[in-house]
Amino acid sequence: WFNKSHRRYGTLWAERFKSLLVEPTGRAIETVAAYIDLNPVRAGLVDDPKDYRFCGYGEAVAGNPDAQRGLLSLRNETDWSTAQAGYRLALFGTAAAPRDHAVSVTPEALQQVVASGGKLPLTTLLRYRIRHFTDGAVLGSQAFVQQQLAAYRTLHHRRARTAVRLMPALTDWGGLVTLRGLRKPALG
């Protein structure tokens, strides 16, 4: 009944969730973790991810030992306070505008800056939906993405019609590349 009345097909969650293979070390995993932890901020649920108990960062700040071990591993640290401070800086950026100002940046203003050739801080971009983090298939360093592409070609005994793609020149991505080139705008 639901599918017929809403002109849909499949299960209710069909096409809702996607997967992305992320390089498990370095800049790629930390960038994606920050992007995920900023989901409640992008949704307008909270101003600070520490206030949202259903995200990993909020759980870690609240004292959950499993979440804290995850952040320690992510930051490659042994001291919780150092790891927490470093990750918080990664979330908000040391040179970023005050949080309230950064949240109030509209998509139109963002597009104007991009059109003028200006680059935005990664911390500002992480407050928007970045399609490469959901539709890029593989995200990581160039060597990691090349390795995954070679494994795919070997496993399926065919040549994939894709190649390593650079992330859009909106900011300094720290060497991150993706497997899939996207035709639609990167943000939104």
Model-derived regions: residue spans:
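Short Pro-Cys-Gly-centered "Cys-loop" motif that presents a nucleophilic cysteine in a tight turn
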Residues: W1-G188
